[in-house]
Amino acid sequence: MARMGRRPGPSTTRTLITAAAAQRFTAVGYDATSLRQVAADAGVDPALVRRFFGSKEQLFTAVASALIDPRRALAAIAEGSADEAGERLLRYFLSLLGDVTQPGPLLGLVRSAVTSEHAARVLREFLAGGLLREIAATSVNSERSGLGAALVASQLVGLAVARYAVQLPSLTAADTQELVRTVAPVLQYYLTGNPISVKEKS
């Protein structure tokens, strides 16, 4: 009988489960995903999924947190000139969504939120409780940080839904630079109160 390999540690197991869940949510959506299916995809016992995450909602939140890392989003805002914070944040967000023909890891969460009220609520709570709070805390314009952060989220989520889920022709046809040129000044205004035109980049 072949000798079994060493069992993965808790950190590795959690990562395997999160990755399997992200793929499952992308493939079939939130409502059609079960903890048992995720466990099978990850090659672990369903009890381990419940032990690490408790419920499907908590697992979805963990996937969102792994994909939309607030620290990276904040780094995108904070690193470099304040006049380009909106552009950096948008480029980071678009990199997670990927191209229309080659979806990125975030697209599964967006599609799940469109088709499932449970997923939409979990994503809203994650944005409000994590990402938006951090953006508000580091906003250049502190007087409007709360509203500005919420408007940033509305712009980004709206863009994701319209371009990748609904697939409005004008948005799907636009390339990254065109989106940055058009949308980044809006995000910049939400963040700082000062819209900045985006320069053409080679």
Residue ranges: model-predicted function:
Residues 61-67:
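Alpha-helical DNA-contacting segments of helix-turn-helix folds
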Residues 72-107:
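Hydrophobic alpha-helical connector segments
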Residues 93, 106-113, 152-156, 160:
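Short alpha-helical scaffolding segments that buttress acidic/His motifs in well-ordered protein cores
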Residues 120-124, 135-190, 194-199:
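Hydrophobic/aromatic-rich alpha-helical bundle segments in the mid-to-C-terminal region
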Residues 1-3, 199-202:
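Short, intrinsically disordered or compositionally biased N-terminal tails of bacterial proteins
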Residues 1-44, 54-58:
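Basic, helix-initiating cap at the start of DNA-binding domains
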Residues 97-126:
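Amphipathic alpha-helical segments used for helix-helix packing
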Residues 47:
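Key DNA-contact positions within bacterial/archaeal DNA-binding proteins
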